[in-house]
Every structure is written in C-alpha cells, then in structure tokens.
Regions:
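C-terminal-biased regions
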Residues: 1-109
C-alpha cells in the first residue's frame, strides 16, 4: 500500500489544506496560492512547513481544529516532527506571553 493510500496521509493532506485556507482567510493569498500549487504537485510536506513558518512569522492564532489535527498527524507518522515541535513551541510561547500580560490575544478562528 502506497503512503498516499493511507488515512494517515489523507489527514496530513487535510492539515496542509487547512493551513492553506487559514492563510488565505488571513489575507496571505500569495503564500496560500504558492502552497496550494506545491500541495497539488508535490504533496503536503512543504505546505505544512510553510504554514507553520507563516503562522509564526505573522504571529497568527491557529484554530483549535488545526491544533488538534496537527497533533493527530504528528502522533500517526514521523513526516512532520520538526514542524510540529516548532508549532508546539510557538503555542507555548504565546500562552506564556498571554499569561504574563505581554500579549493581547487576537480572536481565534
């Protein structure tokens, strides 16, 4: 069975699609369009990596659904260990800033 025939891979693709939609919803159309093209031709790895980078760079608040799906994708396969670690560190730092009063939280999607 090829990797792309497994439910785990389908969830990885869904995560990439969710990140692309998230970027588009926040006005980052160039990034979203580029990642969509990469997803269509090369699979979800680079779009997920780019999504994490954009979330961190633009200081965005990911949805709870995205956080949950990313955790599930990470638990099921090793494809995104580095990106998941960056994502979790970013979320922890945002939580620490929020608790210390340094950050006014934007509304979550």
């Amino acid at each position: 069975m090829a990797a792309f025939d497994r439910p785990e891979y389908d969830r990885y693709v869904r995560l990439a699609e969710m990140m692309i939609s998230f970027l588009r919803d926040h006005g980052y159309n160039y990034d979203a369009n580029l990642d969509q093209d990469i997803l269509d031709h090369d699979g979800p790895g680079v779009p997920v990596e780019n999504g994490v980078d954009a979330i961190i760079e633009f200081n965005l608040t990911p949805s709870k659904d995205m956080i949950t799906l990313f955790g599930q994708v990470h638990d099921e396969n090793p494809w995104c260990d580095e990106e998941y670690e960056q994502f979790r560190n970013y979320l922890r730092e945002r939580e620490d800033e929020h608790q210390s009063g340094k950050l006014i939280p934007p509304s979550a999607d």
